[in-house]
Regions:
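Conserved alpha/beta-domain cores
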Residues: 1-166
């Protein structure tokens, strides 16, 4: 659900920021292209078959004792089945993942710009370039670009705080 996603992204943001900081610092002003997250959605989900086995085991042990755990696993199984894709390499990934879950793109853009700002404040030139992967239509790019620009404005302010980005 969205609350769980946002909590996970809040944990991921500082790790991403730290990684980007190290890259920007090492590159000393050379443009750095960062491709936003684009793994297939199924890579983030538990395996359907494993969930089914876990549910069966919980039910055979003691269904009444494990009622809450069974309900939780069954809810997760339903979500996994809803998100199943015939060909995950072409489906819900790249910009389409960011369109469905804009908070993912926003978190990563914030991490990029926060890291860039930290490096710039140390007097080291920085030039982040944000790449939106697997764009199939101009509207997909426009939607993702708007999220990235919003994050840049939030982090860098109106003047860009001396960080030039693409």
């Amino acid at each position: 659900n969205e609350a769980d996603r946002r909590a996970a992204l809040a944990e991921l943001l500082p790790m991403q920021r730290e990684d980007f900081y190290g890259v920007f610092k090492a590159m000393k002003g050379t443009p750095v292209t960062i491709r936003t997250i684009d793994p297939p959605l199924h890579e983030f989900l538990p395996k359907r078959e494993e969930l089914m086995v876990e549910i069966a085991i919980l039910k055979t042990k003691s269904a009444s004792k494990n009622k809450k755990a069974i309900e939780t696993k069954e809810k997760l199984l339903r979500a996994v089945e809803e998100l199943h894709e015939f060909n995950p390499m072409l489906g819900q990934r790249g910009c389409r993942l960011g369109i469905t879950y804009p908070e993912i793109t926003k978190m990563q853009a914030k991490a990029i710009f926060e890291a860039a700002l930290q490096v710039a404040r140390k007097g080291i030139p920085v030039k982040p370039e944000v790449m939106i992967p697997l764009v199939g239509h101009v509207e997909e790019l426009k939607r993702q670009k708007a999220i990235v620009l919003e994050a840049a404005h939030e982090v860098l302010g109106k003047d860009g705080s001396g960080v030039d980005y693409l």
